Regions:
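RNA-contacting regions in translation and RNA-metabolism proteins
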Residues: 1-206
Length: 206
């Protein structure tokens, strides 16, 4: 992860000064909801370094899941120290993300550590990503529990899993159905991406 200052915008490419060198933020790695202005200081994730005749060309990203992962490592000492492990990240950049965390120490609440006192740790990351919503869920080796957690903030009644097909059937209370699915299916889509399971959601009366 690097911090730099935007020096110029040429066409759709944003150029960032890293001190001794310059990096390129191409349109494919930009967050659609962000505006990039000359003089702005931003954090980015290094995707690759290309060798060119003019020297190394550094390609950076604001959309890469690795950016979110590194921001949590910088903000949460428990992750940096290895007490809390970040198991999975799913992102729809600029909109919403989900991260799954696990604690190696039963006395440390992994979700609480990431949220921080008065929500300050996660808020710093949300601010850096210009109000991208972040759901922090507890990872579990039991897929049914993990899937139920991944659909947070929705409450789940039951989860049936098929290990062979890596698919699940989730029942939620009627009043929680739209929350579980999310706007334009976003919550369910991110939960499936986070857990790597197919998730079929139905309400209690369906």
């Amino acid at each position: 992860i690097i911090t730099g200052v935007i020096t110029r915008v040429e066409g759709k490419n944003v150029f960032i000064d890293l001190g001794k060198t310059e990096a390129i933020l191409p349109p494919t790695e930009q967050i659609a909801t962000e505006t990039y202005r000359e003089g702005d200081r931003i954090k980015c994730y290094i995707v690759e370094v290309k060798k060119t005749t003019k020297g190394p060309q550094i390609m950076i990203s604001r959309t890469h899941p690795g950016l979110l992962k590194r921001l949590f490592e910088l903000e949460v000492p428990e992750i940096f120290e290895g007490v809390v492990e970040l198991k999975s990240v799913a992102r729809e950049p600029g909109m919403r993300s989900k991260i799954a965390v696990y604690s190696r120490d039963e006395n440390v609440d992994p979700v609480g550590a990431c949220v921080g006192p008065k929500g300050q740790r996660v808020q710093h990351i949300v601010d850096e990503l210009h109000d991208e919503k972040i759901d922090i869920v507890k990872w579990d080796e039991d897929p049914a529990i993990y899937i139920a957690n991944s659909l947070s903030p929705a409450k789940v009644i039951s989860v049936d899993v098929s290990e062979e097909e890596k698919s699940s059937y989730v029942v939620v209370p009627d009043y929680q159905l739209s929350l579980a699915i999310g706007k334009a299916g976003q919550n369910a889509r991110l939960a499936a991406k986070l857990t790597n399971w197919k998730i079929d959601i139905k309400s209690e009366t369906q």
